[in-house]
């Protein structure tokens, strides 16, 4: 690997070992003689493969040192003193010692623990650290003896102060690495680990250390850190765990054939197939498959946000979110996207983001084949098929598939509107609604159609618009074979056939097929007219009414007839006009068979059969079939004459009377 300019290249692990071999072996070899050390700067220059090689070499050297006097059935003697802890290794039973290895000298540098053994993470917890890391300083140790000597400077307690025999020597070295290669478990003391590893296979503890050393290189287990790294601080956990771990074996799920290194991980996984949820919330009776999920869920009820940012006074439920947020303030390591230069605090977030550019969607739904960029998105999507709605509102009982939907829904009950527009002061319950609203002020339309260049403020509007170009209408009605571009429009249409009107007005009892129609109808009772014309101040109950009205001021007539060139301000007016050319009369009276080009004409006609006169004068009580007739009649009471002759100034209450009067001036004869 080429060295960066101005920095020295680290020595190769193999070359360092070769140099060690030249030393005088007659003086006796210690582990320190074959140990290889790197500084922090040198360690950072090594790539991943070189770091793995380093660990291989260190383990190989250790195997050579211990094999000189250690094998199955041999006796070992330990000599311990207050000044140092050492081991004498005999070549055979009864022979004199050939070498002395000082455990206090044998240690692995900090970068190794951090990079090669990522699960340890150099955590600083209690003085009795289950991964043999000093709790007060950041120095790392490979053996328990090193840790005890180091802790004497900071802590008077020595939880397992005893003579260190050869098995402890072997187990202590193995602890950091080997427990990640087998089942992934960690235990508070070396003896616990040795007992744990021996029990599943039926062998006695301390019976064979050479087999454990060989496990480093067997079946490439070195590269398998373990799938379930459980940290146990009590011996009873070891006893429980002994019955579920297999040395070198895998536990396979009979449903999906996924394999696990530990049986309790398999048991936990199988709850996905069985649907079993052992941990139940005492507040809402919702159950979970994992205890950690229950603990996180309970925070929803308490409203607790234990992780608070001191700079911005923002609080978080999860520690990971808090750490992620803090990186924005501290300006920590940022991972940059090569395509758009966007930066991220975590490399995993960058990898997920890059799928936007590559189009990769590695997570596919087994039910419908839909794929996603993130596993969490797939997990949420699968609830559509299962019908699971785990997040329930304690006020009204309504349930949701996603927790943020529940949080947003709760604001309906509390009336909370935490997101306020800085331009107009309008507030919103959701941040996404505020962002969309702010585009009205900024004029931003970030979603542009590639076909025609038309842009939109909302992504949903762009998707709806695209169907105009593609002509894609995948949702077809089974009754009339009419097709639609969106599923919810089909559902609304099907209510025409079923007669279903699920949205009912609480004031007058009138029901509607669409919720939007009910909202618009309610404005009749409340008198709300939220859409106001900036030109004349006239207001409307519907946005479409305002758009159509504005065309009176602008003179815009965007809808043109292809037959005669006549243009209209409304699409409905064009459709009605085109029936003049086609002769189409789709609205037929069931009583007499007469047909009409407009539905309003049919409704008015049917009142002739039924005798219905729904429009009544408030002054005299006279009823009328048509609303226009009522308006004309009311002018008798008000004296209003809106139609004035431009020639003589005479005015009339009806337009037809004005037309007839004009013929007096023009001398036109009908």
Curated annotation (Swiss-Prot):
Give the family per the record. Answer: Belongs to the krueppel C2H2-type zinc-finger protein family.
Q: What does this protein do?
A: May be involved in transcriptional regulation.
Q: Describe the location of the KRAB domain by residue ranges.
A: 29-100
- UniProt cross-references to PANTHER family, sorted A to Z: PR DOMAIN ZINC FINGER PROTEIN (PTHR16515), ZINC FINGER PROTEIN 22 (PTHR16515:SF58)
Does the record carry Ubl conjugation as a key word?
Answer: yes
Phosphoserine is carried by which residues? 126
- What biological processes does GO assign it? regulation of transcription by RNA polymerase II
User: Glycyl lysine isopeptide (Lys-Gly) (interchain with G-Cter in SUMO2) cross-link located where?
Assistant: 319
Q: Which CDD domains match?
A: KRAB_A-box
Q: What is this protein called?
A: Zinc finger protein 551
Write out the entry's keywords from A to Z: DNA-binding, Isopeptide bond, Metal-binding, Nucleus, Phosphoprotein, Repeat, Transcription, Transcription regulation, Ubl conjugation, Zinc, Zinc-finger
ZnF bounds (C2H2-type): 251-273, 279-301, 335-357, 363-385, 391-413, 419-441, 447-469, 475-497, 503-525, 531-553, 559-581, 587-609, 615-637, 643-665
Keyword Transcription regulation listed: yes
Q: Which organism is it from?
A: Homo sapiens
């Amino acid at each position: 690997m080429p060295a960066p300019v101005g920095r020295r290249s680290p020595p190769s692990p193999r070359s360092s070992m070769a140099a060690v071999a030249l030393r005088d072996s007659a003086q006796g070899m210690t582990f320190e003689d074959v140990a290889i050390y790197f500084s922090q700067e040198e360690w950072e220059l090594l790539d991943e493969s070189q770091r793995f090689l380093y660990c291989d070499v260190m383990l190989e050297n250790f195997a050579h040192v211990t094999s000189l006097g250690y094998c199955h059935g041999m006796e070992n003697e330990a000599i311990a003193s207050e000044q140092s802890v050492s081991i004498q290794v005999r070549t055979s039973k009864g022979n004199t010692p050939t070498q002395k290895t000082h455990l206090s000298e044998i240690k692995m540098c900090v970068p190794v623990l951090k990079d090669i053994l990522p699960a340890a993470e150099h955590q600083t917890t209690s003085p009795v650290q289950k991964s043999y890391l000093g709790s007060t300083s950041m120095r790392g140790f490979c053996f328990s003896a090193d840790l005890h000597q180091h802790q004497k400077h900071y802590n008077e307690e020595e939880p397992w102060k005893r003579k260190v025999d050869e098995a402890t020597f072997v187990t202590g070295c193995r602890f950091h690495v080997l427990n990640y290669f087998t089942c992934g478990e960690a235990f508070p003391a070396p003896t616990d680990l040795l007992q744990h590893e021996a029990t599943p296979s039926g062998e006695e503890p301390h019976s064979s250390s050479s087999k454990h050393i060989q496990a480093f290189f067997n079946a490439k287990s070195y590269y398998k850190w373990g799938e379930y790294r459980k940290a146990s601080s009590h011996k009873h956990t070891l006893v429980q765990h002994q019955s579920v771990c297999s040395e070198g074996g895998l536990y396979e799920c009979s449903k999906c054939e996924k394999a696990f290194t530990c049986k309790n991980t398999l048991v936990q996984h199988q709850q996905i197939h069985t649907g079993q949820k052992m941990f139940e919330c005492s507040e809402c009776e919702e159950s979970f498959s994992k205890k950690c999920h229950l603990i996180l869920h309970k925070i929803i009820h308490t409203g607790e946000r234990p992780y608070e940012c001191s700079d911005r006074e923002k609080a978080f439920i999860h520690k990971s979110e808090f750490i992620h947020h803090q990186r924005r303030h501290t300006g920590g390591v940022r991972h940059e996207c090569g395509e758009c230069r966007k930066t991220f605090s975590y490399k995993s977030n960058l990898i997920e983001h890059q799928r936007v550019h590559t189009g990769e969607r590695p997570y596919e739904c087994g039910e419908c084949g839909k794929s996603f960029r993130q596993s969490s998105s797939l997990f949420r999507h699968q609830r559509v098929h299962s019908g699971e709605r785990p997040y329930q509102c304690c006020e009204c009982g309504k349930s949701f598939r996603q927790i943020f939907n529940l949080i947003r829904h709760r604001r309906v009950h509390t009336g909370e509107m935490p997101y306020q527009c800085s331009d107009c002061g309008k507030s919103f319950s959701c941040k996404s609604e505020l962002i969309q609203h702010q585009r009205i002020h900024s004029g931003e339309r970030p979603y542009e159609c590639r076909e025609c260049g038309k842009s939109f403020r909302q992504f949903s509007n762009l998707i709806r618009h695209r169907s105009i170009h593609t002509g894609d209408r995948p949702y077809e009605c089974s009754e009339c074979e009419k097709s639609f571009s969106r599923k919810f429009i089909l559902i609304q249409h099907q209510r025409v056939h079923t007669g279903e009107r699920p949205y009912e007005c609480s004031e007058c009892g009138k029901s509607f097929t669409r919720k939007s129609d009910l909202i618009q109808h309610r404005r009749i009772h409340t008198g709300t007219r939220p859409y106001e014309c900036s030109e004349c101040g006239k207001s409307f109950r519907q946005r479409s009414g305002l758009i159509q009205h504005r065309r009176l001021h602008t003179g815009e007539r965007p809808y043109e007839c292809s037959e005669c060139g006549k243009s209209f301000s409304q699409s409905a007016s064009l459709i009605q006009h085109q029936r003049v050319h086609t002769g189409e009369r789709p609205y037929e009276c069931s009583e007499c068979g007469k047909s009409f080009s407009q539905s309003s004409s049919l409704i008015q006609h049917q009142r002739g059969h039924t005798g219905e006169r729904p429009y009544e004068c408030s002054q005299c009580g006279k009823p009328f079939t048509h609303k226009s007739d009522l308006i004309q009649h009311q002018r008798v009471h008000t004296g209003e004459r809106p139609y004035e002759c431009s020639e003589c100034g005479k005015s009339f209450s009806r337009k037809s009377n004005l037309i007839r009067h004009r013929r007096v001036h023009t001398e036109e004869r009908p």
